[in-house]
Amino acid sequence: MSQQYFVIDNGSYNIKAGFSNQDAPIKHQNALSKARDGLIYVGNEYLVQTNNYSGMIFKRPYDHGHLISWETEKAVWDYTFNKASPNQELDASITHLTLTETPFQLPQLSMNTDQIVFEEYGFNEYYRCAPASLVPWSNLGSSESKNNDFTLVVDSGYSGTWIVPIIYQNVYWKGVKKLPIGGAALNGLLREIISFRHYDIADEPVLINTIKEKTCFMATDFEKSLANRKKYRCEFILPDFKTTTTGFVKTKDTPIDTTGDVQSLALIDERFTIPESFYHPEIIFDNTTSSTSTIQNASFKNITDLVVECIMSCPKVTQPLLSGNIITVGGNTNLPGFTDRLRHELVKELPIDWHVQVKETEHNPDEASWFGGAQLTNDEIINNISISKKDYFEHGSNWCQKQFGFKNL
């Protein structure tokens, strides 16, 4: 049989996976979940097997972006492989696996992953890389593919935001920057503010994430929005697990039974203050009660400063080229106004004679890396950068790290 190609974008919140010839990946939570009745669910099983998400507890294999628990991850991967191949059998012995992992992953954790790939599952060939390095490939075939030699990727996910320069299809590691603010930090801040101002929702992770996704946005001008905050007021109807299991935003056309026990949240400045943490990290300092968080114990710059630092740390001749091809990906970039705000701030900070272009991919922002990985498998270069199972057992586990690990050039 001919070789198959399987791509996994192994995010700390969602997994995107599938054969490279699929039209789109399957996407589900990278977690085990436990309901109040004690039942354990894998991935998105809880969405179809229960209609009460209240008090759901999630156990994720990632901590601060690092894959630390293969005991959890293997159960999720088994679920993924079963979901991804209902019509096409996954035979690892003839399958090439493209897998993403966080930049600057600890070498021992990467070696654990390599061991699972080759020794547990027995994949035939393997390529491991940072998610951002696949993003330029996702634009191949588009009218802008000619610009892919110099790309700066802003990947804002669940555990943090990475700014990664890609030069001639290689990560320029000296320029990589990280802002430790991502979806998890936004959810935590939203949880504490709502619990203080309205209802205690500390044990409602599904509800918190739903409120963020349906109501929050990035303000173009934070000070102006704050001064006119009342016009951004919206009412979020909380789930009663009879008429709605997730809750929804009330509109003029929303029919609501006013005689029932309807509970709602009136959200005003929370809608844009939470995402503003990307530009004013002090918002988190002022509103969080955690004393163990990385964010609490470390000072860091905002996203604009880090993008500028990233560009300036790259070779001088590439700097204006990178500023003209900035791509935003990751779940947080689904926030309305995220890309426009970043463009607005960078124009003020970068040289006036540079062209500044910040754009989104043609795909769903949190699926861009998967589509890039699928496109990469169609290029002959995949044969030069992959490691076979034979190479792994012949040279040992360090061989993968030499090939795939980050380079301090």
Swiss-Prot record:
This is Actin-like protein ARP6. Component of the SWR1 complex which mediates the ATP-dependent exchange of histone H2A for the H2A variant HZT1 leading to transcriptional regulation of selected genes by chromatin remodeling. Involved in chromosome stability. Its main location: cytoplasm. The keyword Nucleus applies. The lineage of its organism: Eukaryota, Fungi, Dikarya, Ascomycota, Saccharomycotina. Gene3D superfamilies: 3.30.420.40, Actin, Chain A, domain 4. Keywords: Activator, Chromatin regulator, Cytoplasm, Cytoskeleton, Nucleus, Transcription, Transcription regulation. Component of the SWR1 chromatin remodeling complex. GO terms for cellular component: cytoplasm; cytoskeleton; Swr1 complex. Belongs to the actin family. ARP6 subfamily. One of its GO terms (biological process) is chromatin remodeling. It holds the Pfam family Actin. It comes from Debaryomyces hansenii (strain ATCC 36239 / CBS 767 / BCRC 21394 / JCM 1990 / NBRC 0083 / IGC 2968) (Yeast). It is found in: Cytoplasm; Cytoplasm, Cytoskeleton; Nucleus.
